[in-house]
Regions:
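Catalytic core of DAGKc-family lipid kinases
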Residues: 31-36, 40-120
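Short, active-site-adjacent cap segments at secondary-structure transitions
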Residues: 22-23, 47
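ATP/NTP phosphate-donor binding region
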Residues: 1-14, 24, 60-63
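N-terminal glycine-rich "phosphate-gripper" loop used for MgATP/nucleotide binding
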Residues: 16-20
Length: 120
C-alpha cells in the first residue's frame, strides 16, 4: 500500500530496504506503474537481490543503484498474489511457512525446518 501511495503522489522510484518479503510487498505495489524499484538488501536470504546481482552490502548496493540502470522483469501470480523470485508448492511451501513462523532467519534455520518435518 505504501508503494502504491508513493507512486500516486508522483514517486518515480520506490526503494525497498529489507529482505525478500519486504521486496515482494513493495514490488507488488509497483505492478502496472512506471515507477522503478530500488533494492537495498538487508534480509536473511536476499534471493531476488542476489539473482539481480545487487550486492548485499548496503553501501555497495547504493553504488549500483546510483548507476541508474533500470530493467523490466516478469512476475507470476498464485491465487491473485504476485511473486517476483520464487514460488513453492507442497513440501516446499510447507517449509517456507514453518520458516516464517519460527522467527529464526538464515539458511540453517530453513534446513532445520525441513529436517524437523522430514524426521517426524
Amino acid at each position: 500500500e505504501l508503494a502504491k501511495e508513493a507512486v500516486e503522489r508522483g514517486a518515480d522510484i520506490v526503494c525497498s530496504i529489507g529482505g525478500d518479503g519486504t521486496v515482494n510487498e513493495v514490488a507488488s505495489g509497483l505492478i502496472h506503474t512506471n515507477a522503478a524499484l530500488a533494492i537495498i538488501p538487508s534480509g536473511s536470504g536476499n534471493g531476488l537481490a542476489r539473482h539481480l546481482r545487487i550486492p548485499t552490502d548496503p553501501l555497495s548496493a547504493i553504488k549500483v543503484l546510483n548507476r541508474g540502470l533500470v530493467q523490466s522483469m516478469d512476475y507470476g501470480t498464485v491465487n491473485g498474489r504476485p511473486f517476483f523470485c520464487t514460488c513453492g508448492v507442497g513440501f516446499d511451501a510447507f517449509i517456507s511457512q514453518k520458516f516464517a513462523e519460527s522467527g529464526k532467519r538464515g539458511p540453517v534455520s530453513n534446513m532445520e525446518s525441513g529436517l524437523n518435518k522430514s524426521l517426524r
